[in-house]
Amino acid sequence: MSERIDFDVNDEDLRREFLCDVLPRAIASLESHTQSRWGGMSAQQMVEHLTWAFDLSTGTRQVECPYAEDKRARLKAFLYDNRPSPQDFMNPALVGGLPPLEHPALPEARAALLASVRRFLDPPDEGTDVRHMHPIFGPLDRDEWSRTHFKHGFHHLSQFGLVARRDDERAP
């Protein structure tokens, strides 16, 4: 059964609650045999994909952004509108397919994700101007990464039936 949550990317407290409470609770309930409702990811692939994104946001991993600055600015507007990511969205960084799994099983992948989330939530004092590269939006600051993680996390947790918008009548 999906946990029904409010969806408001512009509510900083709600985003923090999602990252601190909803995401860890949902990931804890995920089983390796849980099937996605759309897309081709397994449960472990989804968890490792989220870890990758959190690692980008802390500078633990790096990626290039192929888009010119003017296109990045247009794409970045998505971080501020209150629409969820579409189900059929294809990340250009994954056009060649999903990377190989890094962990032997879901429990290890889950632990790695939770550690990455903690690194994002409790960063070392690195100043307020620090930006890390996103593969679509370009360099993002902490607020923009928080918006990204909220939308991205909601998208993938919805993909596996772990969360749904409180106001979505169609959700189970």
PLM region spans:
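Short, contiguous alpha-helical
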Residues: 33-85, 122, 132-172
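Short helix-to-loop capping/linker segments positioned immediately adjacent to catalytic or ligand/cofactor-binding
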Residues: 30-38, 100-103
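Hydrophobic packing residues in well-ordered alpha-helices of helical domains and bundles
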Residues: 20-23, 106, 110-113, 146-149
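Short helix/strand-capping connector loops at secondary-structure junctions
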Residues: 90-98, 128-141
